[in-house]
Amino acid sequence: MGFVGDFCDDVARSIGFLSRIPMPARHFEGYDGRLSRAVRAFPFAGLAIALPSAAVAMALMALQVSSLFAAFVVVAIQALVTGALHEDGLGDTADGFGGGRDREAALAIMKDSRIGTYAAVALILSFGLRVSAFASILPLFSPLGAAMAILGAACLSRAAMVWHWSSLPPARSSGVAASAGEPEPAATRFALAFGLLVAMLLFYLAQVPALGVIAALVAFLATVKGFARLAMRKIGGQTGDTIGATQQLTEIAVLGALALTV
């Protein structure tokens, strides 16, 4: 199978892994569940996953609906499409990092499915910050531009997941991230290049000012690097939860940067 066929398989597997969107079974024939190569398609999968919310946002803004209502709808659709996968990772990470006395305690807490105080606060802040950021920026763009801004942030945040995953060792020998394998260096480079280039193109087409683009890039870089350092200090590496938390934190940072500068 050539590059196009392999990439289509990787896109389908990435979308299937990151969301509740059903994918054709033919893309999973002989698939062992590892994502070492498939992570190169994470940014593209982010575009597909965010497309429903972007389309609804475009329609609502064209109808001149309240930007706050539109922002709530956008975030709600994103959570439904992903099954709140990334929010779950953020909540578990917040509980583990906040309540764990040491590495072992933090990892044990992160495996607990119950929601603690730190998780509740983190999720409230995540939804609140994203809704407020969307409410701030959506009316500043044309309806199509608003959709492109949503897609750009989604693309960047999925590239951030690959960067975090590839830059840290597994914090535990079992779990989703460990069983899915370590991202291949070539796949990581492709994901970062694709994610950055496509996000910048979408921001350009949305007519985001140069200051906004620079601020979004700085927010992207600072969040991924800063959170990776925190994860390394707290648990000695990455897990599926910290990968999901990276998506949430990066999207919040990028949207916040746009809200402050557009």
From Swiss-Prot:
InterPro entries: CobS. Pathway: Cofactor biosynthesis; adenosylcobalamin biosynthesis; adenosylcobalamin from cob(II)yrinate a,c-diamide: step 7/7. Pfam families: CobS. Signal peptide: none annotated. Its cofactor is Mg(2+). One of its GO terms (cellular component) is plasma membrane. The chain crosses the membrane at residues 41-63, 68-85, 115-134, 141-163, 201-221. The keyword Cell membrane applies. Its EC number is 2.7.8.26. GO terms for molecular function: adenosylcobinamide-GDP ribazoletransferase activity; cobalamin 5'-phosphate synthase activity. Its main location: membrane. It is a multi-pass membrane protein. It catalyses: alpha-ribazole + adenosylcob(III)inamide-GDP = adenosylcob(III)alamin + GMP + H(+); alpha-ribazole 5'-phosphate + adenosylcob(III)inamide-GDP = adenosylcob(III)alamin 5'-phosphate + GMP + H(+). Keywords: Cell inner membrane, Cell membrane, Cobalamin biosynthesis, Magnesium, Membrane, Transferase, Transmembrane, Transmembrane helix. It is found in: Cell inner membrane. GO terms for biological process: cobalamin biosynthetic process. Joins adenosylcobinamide-GDP and alpha-ribazole to generate adenosylcobalamin (Ado-cobalamin). Also synthesizes adenosylcobalamin 5'-phosphate from adenosylcobinamide-GDP and alpha-ribazole 5'-phosphate. Associated with a large complex of proteins. Belongs to the CobS family. This is Adenosylcobinamide-GDP ribazoletransferase. The lineage of its organism: Bacteria, Pseudomonadati, Pseudomonadota, Alphaproteobacteria, Hyphomicrobiales. The gene is cobV.
